[in-house]
A protein has these predicted regions:
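N-terminal accessory targeting/assembly segments
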Residues: 1-120
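Conserved beta-strand/loop subsegment of P-loop NTPase cores
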Residues: 49-52, 295-300, 324-336
Length: 352
């Protein structure tokens, strides 16, 4: 399935939106928006503006308040800066179908959330049939509860006709409930097929792991873009694709490594990130099995990152979610040459 969010034909401009809440202070929100901007750039968008708002929790109707939404609308449609052509607004949290529908109706531009952006990047990065199948399944899981919103969006954009040939109108009068239900069945059938394919892939990979013999298996884990693939290249003395972008690695790479006459198998797999979509973790079960089946985990940490401690916690939580938290683990601090205490926002030395 092709990526369905950002076109590669031209660079689209984007506005980011985040919330400062009771559980997420301003510094944390700005860090999350920095990461969201990196995600947007990885997907091929150019970020031109950020908006934040202090709220106890996200507005269930429009995510931000009415006044803030109007401020964003005015910025997007400011005639004095028409050449800016803001193409999308990206929200730092996952939005419900109702929120997306209401925000789109107000802003009249494409609305994305962190989840759809991550899914788009995964779709761009997927190279093998295995990765493509896993991403497609995750996309359908995300899309299914939002089908009605997608149909409404298409009707507004194209004014399509329904099964009876009549011109479309507001809501679902164009495609109609029958078409909506038909599409839902098509997606459910496609998801069943993808799950069957992944089950076969699971069996094949399990056989491959069994055929590797009794060599010790070591897996590199860590936050995305911390240097796992670079370390893999160094230890295995073979080229592994590495790039200063998020999720440069999706497919698992396994190499035989010998250090001081001790042979072992070293695997490099997808990195983790804050607010990683649950559906994506579930869909990548066969890839993450390399982590679950490992004898030892090397947890790579970018020690130069100002929020490296939270990144450690995110990785540990994700490992627990996939059933790999009990594995023997060694913390490996990377980019130590760029580390300075002044970069770390802590009141006392870190426990790590």
């Amino acid at each position: 399935m092709k990526e369905f969010v950002i076109s590669e034909a031209k660079v689209e401009t984007a506005v980011l939106v985040g919330l400062i809440t009771q559980t997420q202070d301003e510094r944390k929100t700005n860090e999350y928006l920095d990461e969201l901007a990196f995600l947007a750039e990885t997907a091929g968008a150019e970020v031109v503006k950020r908006f934040t708002q202090k709220l106890p929790t996200a507005n269930s109707v429009t995510y931000v308040g009415k006044g803030k939404l109007e401020e964003i609308r005015q910025y997007i449609h400011d005639e004095e800066e028409a050449e800016r052509e803001v193409g999308m607004v990206i929200f730092d949290d996952e939005l419900s179908a109702k929120q997306i529908r209401n925000i789109e109706a107000e802003l009249k531009v494409k609305i994305l959330d962190r989840t759809s952006l991550i899914l788009d990047i995964f779709a761009m990065r997927a190279q093998t049939a295995n990765a493509k199948t896993q991403v497609e399944l995750a996309q359908y899981k995300y899309m299914l509860p939002r089908l009605q919103r997608l149909w409404t969006h298409l009707e507004r954009q194209g004014g399509g006709s329904g099964a009876g040939g009549g011109k479309g109108s507001v809501g679902l009068r164009g495609p109609g409930e029958t078409q909506l239900e038909m599409d839902r069945r098509i997606i459910l059938n496609r998801m069943s097929l993808l799950k069957e394919r992944l089950a076969e892939i699971d069996k094949q990979k399990a056989t491959q792991r069994k055929n590797r013999g009794r060599l010790i298996r070591v897996a590199l884990v860590g936050y995305t873009n911390v240097g796992k693939s670079t370390l893999m290249t160094l230890l295995s003395k073979s080229e592994v694709f590495a790039e200063n972008k998020l999720f440069a690695t999706l497919d698992t790479t396994v190499r035989k490594v010998i250090i001081e006459n001790l042979p072992f198998l070293l695997s490099d797999t997808v990195g983790f990130i804050r607010k990683l979509p649950t559906d994506l973790v579930d869909s990548f079960k066969s890839t993450l099995d390399e982590v679950r089946e490992a004898d030892l985990l090397l947890h790579i940490v970018d020690i130069s990152h100002p929020d490296f401690e939270e990144q450690i916690e995110v990785v540990n939580k994700t490992l627990a979610d996939i059933g790999a938290s009990g594995k023997p683990m060694i913390l490996v601090f990377n980019k130590i040459d760029a580390y300075t205490l002044s970069l770390i926002h802590i009141s006392e030395p870190t426990r790590h």
